[in-house]
Every structure is written in structure tokens, then in C-alpha cells.
Amino acid sequence: MKKTFCFILILVCIVLKSVNAEEEDNFEESSLEMETARCASKNERCGNALYGTKGPGCCNGKCICRTVPRKGVNSCRCM
């Protein structure tokens, strides 16, 4: 009985430690993004998840996207 209790206690400690380590990694990544995050000015390229484009959001205005006819790709700019 005592061995089973110790075994369960050790497993719980390992699980809690791994969950805590993942949270710390996520915190470091999000703080890095905050430092490097910037917004796009008027007429600069921007990102729009609906169109599958990556990039910063717009400082002012909206991210307007259009499909380039011959290439079939989306191009987004701040307006």
C-alpha cells in the first residue's frame, strides 16, 4: 500500500512539473512576440487570416485583400 501511494505521488509530481514547464515555454514565446510585434502603416503589406496571408496587422484602417489574377495569390495592404 505504501509503495503504491509513493508511486502515484511520484507520477503526479512528474505530470505537474511537465505541465509547468510547457506554460513557461509558452510565456517566453508570447513575450518574444510582444517585443517584436509591430503594425503596418497605410499602403504597407498586412496579414489577414481569412485570406491566408501572414504579416502584421494595420495600425490604422483595415487590411484589404485582393487576389492577383494571373498568379492566383492574395495580396493584402492597409487602407
Swiss-Prot record:
Compartments it resides in: Secreted
Signal keyword on record: yes
Known tissue expression: Expressed by the venom duct.
Signal peptide range: 1-21
GO MF annotations, alphabetized: calcium channel regulator activity; toxin activity
Major localisation: secreted
Disulfides per UniProt: 39-59, 46-63, 58-78, 65-76
Notes on the domains: Adopts an inhibitor cystine knot (ICK) fold. Is defined as a knottin (one disulfide bond crosses the macrocycle formed by two other disulfide bonds). The presence of a 'disulfide through disulfide knot' structurally defines this protein as a knottin.
Protein name: Omega-phylotoxin-To1a
Organism of origin: Tibellus oblongus (Oblong running crab spider)
